[in-house]
Each structure stands twice: as C-alpha cells, then as structure tokens.
A protein has these predicted regions:
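Hydrophobic alpha-helical membrane segments
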Residues: 1-276
Length: 276
C-alpha cells in the first residue's frame, strides 16, 4: 500500500465527516463502480429468479438479502483499488470473485456474523488486512474505540432508507393508479388466495424493486464504512502527518535543486567576471 497513490484528501475528520467523504467517493468513482456492480448483481439476481421454481419465488428476495456480505466484498474491492489509483476493469472484478469468496471470511459473515451491525467497518480487517484470530480481534477492538457507534448507525440508517424508498414507490403507484389493478399485483405476494400469474408478477416486482433500491444504497453504505475505516487508520497511524511531511520533503527537494542551480550559475558568473 503506497500512501502517495491515494486519490482522495487524507486528513483527520470526525466520524460523520468520514461517512460523508465515503458518499462523495461513490460520486467520484461511479464509472468504475457501477458497471461491474450492475453486471454482477443483476446477472446473479435474474439467474436465481429464473432457476427458482415458481412455488419458491418468495424466497428469492430473502436469498438476495442474505447474501449482502458477498456483495459488500465486491464493492470494497472496487473502492480499495480506486482509492490507490489501481487500474480496474469489470473483467478484473469478475476474476477476483474466487478470492473474495474464499479468502475474506465470507462463511462467517453469512452465518454467525450475519447480523453484525458493524460489518461494514469490520470487513476491511478481513479483506484488506487479512487478519485472523487474536490479531483480528485486537485490531477490531482498536478500530471500534471511536467508530463503532457510527458504523452501527450507518447500517441502521441505510437499512431504513431501503424500505422507506420501497414503500414510497409503492405509495406512489397507489396514488397514480386509478384502477387499483397495480395495487392488486403489488399486494399479491402477501395474499395466499391471489391468482398464480398475478402473484408471480407481484413477487417479481417486489423483488426487483427492492434490488434496484439496494443497487443504489449499498455502494453508499460500503463507501461510508470504508471511509470510516480509513479515518480510523489515519487517526491511529497519522497518515495525514506522513503525507504532509512527504509533500514538504518534495517541495524542499525542488527548492534545494533550484537554489543549487542558482548558486552554480552565480559562481560561474563571478568566475567569468574576475577572469576578465
């Protein structure tokens, strides 16, 4: 990891400013984030939908929701590569999937750690630092001293945003549909007496409307969590001071070079003057 390659302004921030920086990172890196994110998320979702028997379509939403830790690993990989100015294509993201699945603690994240509210802050320890066991626990405890509560609230806020957006879209549909036919389709997943064709489309709309909202919100969540992690690293390891000293050293080298050149020119000029 080369601090000189970082593409964002590293300085000490409070936790909420760090989260705001993460949101700005999504806007700045969107060309690198969304092509791969869109391809992987929606191709997996559509494959799962069409392979699932009609009687079990209701569970597609649950499976997609449960696999959030997998998607977070993809997003963190993209953000970490972009942060350090590493060239990245969609093919690079796809080729990294086997390692992201097997080398980042995904099994734990999908089982007994699934409901951790600080999973976004903890993920870089697993994925980027590759720490395990006692070293991971000590590192996590240290990072949590000043960022844990903000990481938890970020998780809660993003989860609420997803459902607020979902219910807002449903409410909008109800308001603009004078026939109530769309409403009948939308509520069919929760009606055991609904006709099968109606229920099929109701489940499809519900699942992929939520997926669209998740497609928007989750990069914000992961970038905010990653920025929290970076801010704690900056606090603990004084990245901002190190970068400031490096910048100062670069400027001094430039000044020294120009000063030396000026002295040489002056010396040559004086020598020529006296020889004449």
């Amino acid at each position: 990891m080369r601090l000189d390659d970082i593409t964002t302004n590293i300085r000490l921030r409070n936790a909420w400013e760090a989260i705001d920086l993460g949101f700005a990172m999504v806007q700045y890196y969107w060309k690198a984030v969304y092509p791969a994110w869109t391809l992987l998320l929606f191709s997996f979702a559509f494959t799962l939908w069409f392979l699932t028997p009609d009687d079990y379509k209701t569970y597609v939403f649950f499976v997609l929701w449960w696999l959030k830790p997998l998607y977070d690993r993809i997003l963190l990989f993209i953000f970490s590569q972009q942060l350090f100015n590493q060239p990245l294509s969609t093919a690079d993201v796809v080729s990294a999937l086997p390692r992201l699945i097997t080398k980042t603690g995904l099994f734990q994240a999908l089982t007994f750690r699934r409901f951790s509210l600080s999973r976004g802050l903890n993920l870089p320890i697993w994925q980027l630092e590759q720490l395990r066991g006692k070293a991971r626990r000590e590192r996590q405890k240290l990072l949590h001293l000043q960022a844990h509560s903000q990481a938890v609230w970020l998780t809660i806020a993003c989860s609420h945003f997803e459902y607020i957006f979902l219910f807002s879209l449903y409410l909008l549909i109800i308001l603009i549909d004078p026939t109530d036919k769309l409403w009948e389709i939308l509520k069919s997943p929760f009606d055991e007496f609904a006709d099968e064709p109606v229920k099929y489309w109701g489940e499809f709309i519900y699942t992929f409307t939520y997926l669209l909202i998740y497609w928007i919100v989750e990069p914000l969540y992961m970038a905010g969590s990653f920025s929290l992690y970076l801010n704690r690293r900056t606090q603990l390891e004084a990245w901002d001071i190190e970068l400031a000293f490096r910048s100062l050293a670069d400027r001094l080298r430039g000044i020294s070079y120009h000063t030396f050149t000026g002295l040489v020119a002056l010396s040559v000029g004086v020598s020529i003057f006296y020889t004449q």
